[in-house]
């Protein structure tokens, strides 16, 4: 291998490693939404799940420990 090809290969490898370490930073990479982000974006107060499902979740206390029911049964769980 010629030194130029080897140098290009090494520089590309360094670039890949650096960019892989920057995901989710100020560059707007692959940042996953947190529960707080979803709550901020969800302004309407309604239940996405069926009425019976939300009532069962409230009766079993799932509104307090389950993020799934907390986000999808807002009205029944009394979160808005």
From Swiss-Prot:
Residues 45-80 form the ShKT domain. Keywords: Disulfide bond, Ion channel impairing toxin, Nematocyst, Neurotoxin, Potassium channel impairing toxin, Secreted, Signal, Toxin, Voltage-gated potassium channel impairing toxin. Residues 21-38 form a propeptide. Residues 68-69 are annotated as: Crucial for binding to potassium channels. InterPro entries: ShKT_dom. One of its GO terms (molecular function) is potassium channel regulator activity. GO terms for cellular component: extracellular region; nematocyst. It is found in: Secreted; Nematocyst. PROSITE patterns: SHKT. Disulfide bonds join 45-80, 54-73, 63-77. Its main location: secreted. It comes from the Eukaryota. Residues 1-20 form the signal peptide. It holds the Pfam family ShK. Inhibits voltage-gated potassium channels (Kv1/KCNA). Belongs to the sea anemone type 1 potassium channel toxin family. Type 1b subfamily. This is U-actitoxin-Avd9c. It comes from Anemonia viridis.
């Amino acid at each position: 291998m010629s030194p130029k090809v080897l140098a290009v290969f090494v520089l590309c490898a360094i670039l890949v490693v650096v960019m892989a370490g920057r995901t989710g930073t100020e560059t707007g990479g692959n940042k996953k939404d947190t529960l707080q982000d979803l709550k901020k974006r969800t302004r309407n107060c309604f239940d996405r799940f069926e009425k019976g499902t939300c009532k069962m979740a409230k009766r079993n206390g799932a509104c307090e420990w389950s993020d799934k029911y907390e986000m999808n049964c807002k009205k029944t769980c009394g979160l808005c």
